[in-house]
UniProtKB/Swiss-Prot annotation:
Keywords: Acyltransferase, ATP-binding, Cytoplasm, Nucleotide-binding, RNA-binding, Transferase, tRNA processing, tRNA-binding. The keyword RNA-binding applies. Its EC number is 2.3.1.193. The keyword Mitochondrion does not apply. This is tRNA(Met) cytidine acetyltransferase TmcA.
Length: 672
């Protein structure tokens, strides 16, 4: 039998059995593409090619793949030769029909550990691509253990294998499967309220929503992040399919008996809350699986708002057979299961550190930690797995009970920027990679040298549900403080809720910043807090906490959410205010960063300052102000607001203004 005959026979068998498979093609770039093109020519299908520079249609970049979720393809090629976008790879696997091949193009097998991976630029905070040896070895180990996955290496013999026959698969007929039928029955009888259907890919969520619409007695409107992702839902809903984009739906005032939101987790929470409040009955479908991190947030944060929530789960695959080899290998390679939650860890708690090398030496340990963190955090995705494995500057603590993981803490090194770079960040001229909290302390705080301090940021913390409320989280933080004794502070950035803030307070953190926008993933405002470890860290924490207290009333009015601390009602312009105001007027500090001191400036200035007063005192929108002041665009408006701030400062004290300009990076070169 020729190679093509063997390939076609194996593909026919896969179609009959309702499964998909992964073929890894490893070698020089040109050789890999040539093999992929030969297989593509031998098998009919869609053959979506995912690559930064795909040679054939249909194609898309890994970053654009998100827009195709909800669609189906027969066969696909994923080019990871330059860099492995694990989330896009997993998402692509979820779009493939039964009987499909997923071809994964990789560099020469022997170079995987040492070869720089361009995807690392997204998660390593490094200026250049870095090798990713832990992930490479993990992937090799996973592939070598799976006889259902094929590996074709350049200059190595390869033949298409034969596999024992499986049970013949009966594809879905369009009629509801047993799981779907049970949920449809419950939905038809549901009183006014919110229902969710959650499941991994391929379980028929979109089909279920379409079937429900086609069979319901009332009317329904469908919304989703993108209409292109509702193809399956539309096919099942038939002529009763009525789609409106989320923003258009809010603006329209349209009404219906049901609102059906497909892939609800991908819609920003504030927008989703507004939509939900408008309809008597709401059906939300979403994917809860590791490659779509916000799907977890949908469970952890959004769904928790509805105590009478009707929650349904689809477990049986509909679009392929159970135990599909492709689904299994993707789940194993990217650790999508949650075995860490299967058994409660009983016994005395021991806390210890572990390092990235553990992924090679004792992989079960970091795997269990990652599973725990994934289950507890709404943002965890394969990008975090790659960062955990190979990014520099990561620190890990585990709390174990009888060798089972009961808690985990993940910290990231931050700060230590040069004085010059920290000042440039404060001015708004530079935004170097990484350093989330350290940069924010400089860019949004009052101290131009804040980013020179050295800290460790809490990236993730989790405790097993069976061991919560025992103080394990606080023990982990206390241990982290001892390990970071040479640092100036520990920091944390989190979606603010009163409950979460109480935990960080108990750990010793001081609140230093509240953001101006709600997070898309949680619907909460971002809060930042410091736990000082050195004298310099204490001074910074006290200074920024006091600044937040001075700005508390203004931020509360602006955000519509109370700041959880005692406001200081000091209206005098102090030294920090003057420095910040000069930074806004003559550099590039953002307006929202400067809300407090700008409000205080307006109290002191007798000038009209219409661009500033219109925005800050009247809360007019940028569009309203541009029309009122006859200027075109936000850039021109911001330039005018800076110029008016400069005018007010000079009118109050021209000498002080000039002396502060002189000590800014670049001195007086920056125009107001």
């Amino acid at each position: 039998m020729s190679d093509i005959d063997a390939l076609q026979a194996l593909t026919s068998q896969m179609t009959q059995e309702g499964i998909r498979r992964l073929l890894v093609i490893s070698g020089d770039a040109a050789w890999c593409r040539k093999r992929a093109e030969a297989i593509r020519a031998a098998l009919p299908g869609d053959w979506l090619w995912v690559a930064p520079d795909a040679p054939a249609q249909p194609c898309c970049t890994p970053q654009a793949l998100q827009t195709l979720l909800g669609r189906e393809f027969r066969h696909a090629i994923f080019d990871a030769w330059q860099g492995f976008d694990a989330a896009a790879f997993a998402a692509l696997s979820g779009t493939l029909q039964a009987g499909s091949w997923l071809l994964l193009l990789m560099p020469p097998y022997e170079t995987w550990e040492s070869r720089p991976d361009t995807d690392s630029l997204r998660w390593s905070d490094c200026a250049q691509p870095i090798p990713t040896p832990q992930f490479a070895q993990h992937l090799k180990r996973t592939l070598s253990r799976d006889p259902q996955t094929l590996l074709w290496r350049q200059r190595q013999p390869f033949c298409w294998p034969s596999y024992p026959s499986r049970e013949c698969w009966r594809p879905a007929t369009g009629e509801p499967q047993p799981e779907q039928a049970a949920i449809l029955s419950r939905l038809r009888e549901m009183p006014p309220g919110v229902a969710t259907v959650i499941a991994p890919r391929g379980r028929g969520k979109s089909a279920l929503a379409g079937q429900f619409i086609s069979r319901m007695a009332g009317t329904a409107i469908v919304t989703a992040p993108a209409k292109t992702a509702t193809d399956i839902l539309a096919a099942f809903a038939g002529e009763r399919f009525c789609f409106m984009a989320p923003d258009a739906l809010l603006a329209s005032g349209a009404r219906a008996d049901w609102l059906v939101v497909d892939e609800a987790a991908a819609i920003p929470t504030p927008l989703l809350l507004q939509l939900v409040s408008r309809f008597p009955r709401i059906l939300l479908t979403t994917t809860v699986q590791g490659y779509e991190g916000t799907g977890r947030g949908f469970l952890l944060k959004f769904c928790a708002r509805f105590p009478q929530l009707h929650r349904f789960t689809l477990r049986q695959p509909v679009r392929w057979a159970p135990e599909c080899p492709l689904e299994n290998i993707v789940s194993e390679a990217l650790i999508f299961d949650d075995e860490a939650f299967a058994q409660a860890p009983h016994g005395a708690i021991e806390i210890s550190a572990f390092y990235q090398q553990a992924w090679v030496n004792t992989p079960a340990l970091p795997r269990a930690v990652y599973q725990l963190l994934s289950g507890a955090h709404y943002r965890t995705s394969p990008l975090d797995l790659r960062r955990m494995m190979d990014a520099p500057g990561q620190h890990f603590l585990q709390a174990t009970a009888n060798n089972r993981v009961a808690g985990a803490l993940w910290l990231v090194e931050e700060g230590g920027l040069s004085a010059e770079l920290s000042q440039a960040v404060w001015c708004g001229f530079r935004r170097p990679r990484g350093n989330l909290v350290a940069q924010s302390l400089a860019a949004h705080g009052s101290d131009p040298l804040a980013a020179t301090l050295v800290g460790r940021r809490v990236s993730r913390i989790a405790v097993h549900p069976a061991r919560q409320r025992e103080g394990i989280g606080q023990q982990l933080i206390a241990c982290a403080c001892m390990q970071a004794a040479q640092c100036d502070y520990l920091s944390v950035s989190f979606g603010y809720t009163p409950k979460l803030w109480r935990f960080w307070q108990r750990c010793g953190f001081v609140l230093v910043r509240m953001g101006n926008h709600r997070e898309a993933s949680s619907g909460c405002y971002t809060a930042m807090a410091l736990l000082p470890l050195s004298d310099a860290g204490k001074r910074l924490a006290q200074q920024e906490h006091r600044r937040l207290r001075r700005d508390a009333d203004i931020l509360t009015q602006w955000n519509g959410e109370a700041i959880p601390l005692a406001a200081l009602r000091e209206q005098a312009l102090n030294d920090e205010d003057w420095r910040e105001l000069v930074g806004f007027a003559f550099a590039h500090r953002p307006l929202l960063t400067s809300l407090g001191c700008l409000h205080r400036l307006l109290q002191y200035s007798a000038l009209p300052l219409p661009a500033l007063r219109g925005r800050l005192e009247e809360k007019a929108s940028d569009a309203e102000l541009c029309a009122r002041l006859r200027i075109s665009g936000r850039k021109a408006l911001l330039a005018l607001q800076r110029a008016q701030a400069a005018q007010a400062l000079i009118a109050l004290d021209a000498g002080r203004t000039q002396s502060l300009r002189d000590v800014m990076p670049g001195g007086g070169d920056h125009a107001g």
